[in-house]
From Swiss-Prot:
Keyword set includes Transport: yes
Lineage, highest ranks first: Bacteria, Pseudomonadati, Pseudomonadota, Alphaproteobacteria, Hyphomicrobiales
MF terms in GO: proton-transporting ATP synthase activity, rotational mechanism
Keyword check for Ion transport: yes
GO CC list: plasma membrane; proton-transporting ATP synthase complex
Name of the featured protein: ATP synthase subunit delta
Subcellular location: Cell inner membrane
Naturally occurring in which organism (per UniProt): Bartonella henselae (strain ATCC 49882 / DSM 28221 / CCUG 30454 / Houston 1) (Rochalimaea henselae)
Family listed: Belongs to the ATPase delta chain family.
Length: 197
């Protein structure tokens, strides 16, 4: 899988529609195939500025939106015709329920739901300096043992944290950076001086 997803909370509407699509895909035994169809649709949505504008615009009628979404689905060469039909019907439901503006979020939430069903997670790592491959492997191994699944590391370097790491996995954050420790020390010293010590 090219993408993995963290556990950062999504809007409830996105989650509910994504879960409904996931449940349908599971019932039909088409989770992986539908995931590819969603990926194809999202690629078109990301690349077509007119379609992006259309999806976000409140100025089109539901009838026009249904027609355009059907046309878009007809023109995407889905790997599996059944998955394309399920996605097309799902887009129709979203459109009829006036949720087209949430389309991108819903489809990304579906991808995330599929990744979670495979126990795949994404961790954001901020380091003061680049990690070597051994450090990356150790960190990945520790995080995988914590979550009980596959963890993909997204590592960025920020020299401003001075040292240590900031790890974000889902809604949790572990901050072992030197900057955070200095900030804590500063607060403790201010408190002590305010207390008269």
């Amino acid at each position: 899988m090219s993408n993995s997803f963290s556990l950062i909370p999504l809007p409830l509407v996105d989650q509910r529609y994504a879960q409904a699509l996931f449940d349908l895909a599971q019932e039909e035994g088409l989770v992986e195939i539908l995931e590819k169809a969603v990926e194809s649709f999202l690629m078109v949505l990301d690349q077509d500025e007119d379609l992006k504008h259309f999806v976000q615009s409140p100025f089109f009628s539901v009838k026009e939106q249904v027609k355009v979404m059907h046309s878009v689905c007809e023109n995407i060469p889905f790997a599996d015709e059944g998955a394309g039909q399920i996605l097309s019907r799902f887009l129709r439901v979203i459109t009829l329920n006036h949720r087209l503006r949430a389309l991108s979020g819903i489809l990304h939430a579906f991808q995330r739901r599929v990744a979670l069903s495979r126990r795949e997670f994404s961790a954001q790592i901020i380091a003061a300096r680049p990690l070597n491959s051994q450090q990356e492997q150790q960190l990945q191994s520790v995080l995988e043992s914590v979550v009980g699944g596959k963890v993909f590391l997204n590592i960025c370097v920020d020299p401003e944290i001075l040292g240590g790491l900031i790890i974000r996995l889902g809604s949790s954050q572990i901050d072992t950076s030197l900057m955070a420790k200095l900030s804590s020390l500063k607060i403790a010293l201010k408190k002590r001086s305010a207390d008269g010590y």
